Amino acid sequence: MWYFRALHRRRAHWLAALLPPGPARVLDAGCGTGGFIRVLRAAQPAWSVTGLDLSPLACGLARERTRAEIAEGSITALPFAEGTFDAVTTGDVLYHVEDTLAALREFQRCVRPGGVVVVNEPAYRWLWSYHDDAVESKHRFTAPGLGSRFRAAGLKVVFSSYANMLPLPLVVARRKLFPPAQPTSDVQLYPAPIEALFAGMAALEHAWTTRGWSLPAGSSVFVAGVRR
């Protein structure tokens, strides 16, 4: 699925860009069934990747599929000591919790001084739609707003950008002009030509942002920071 491939690539790139070479301890907070853990392990064999998820079912599947250490718990109360990790990352999880600042403070607490926090979340309250109802969203963010939360949590923002800018007109049209009869998630596998189109758009955006250039708009927002 193009969306998850792009999301995994974005997070993996910035973790690798901001962490020093060599071994690292990384937490995937809200790891689901372990898809991103597998991506990181393949890309960075020297890293020790731990997962955490609120769902017992997801934790069980993640353990089975990755053989990694998987903890059951909430991102607002991480069951780890201060400074346990070199990096904490989450992808489209923060928007599910009421107290997003509490979660970011937990991420800050659990990384060492100078440690990295990488977050990707849905963008723009005005883009709220049937999709958000289907996936039980509580928030959508802007880049300035999410960056402000990072700073309030004791994190220094080192890169901030929107993502999925090129598909944004199609997303707006789908969600605002042609909504389905029943609430459903837009994150799904599309026919191969559509998947290829979106994957090509994502590749162009990745080439842009990996140069350190931000995108001014998009259906997702991405922030990377370090613990002060």
Go through each PLM region and give its residues.
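Conserved N-terminal segment of class I S-adenosyl-L-methionine
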Residues: 1-81, 87, 91, 104, ...
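Short conserved AdoMet
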Residues: 63, 98, 112
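Short catalytic micro-motifs in class I SAM-dependent methyltransferases
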Residues: 92-96
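A short glycine-rich, Lys/Arg-flanked "PGG" loop and its adjoining helix->strand segment in the class I
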Residues: 101-116
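Short, glycine-/aromatic-enriched active-site segment of Class I SAM-dependent methyltransferases
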Residues: 117-139, 145-149
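Conserved S-adenosyl-L-methionine
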Residues: 155-165
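A C-terminal cap/extension of S-adenosyl-L-methionine-dependent methyltransferases
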Residues: 167-228
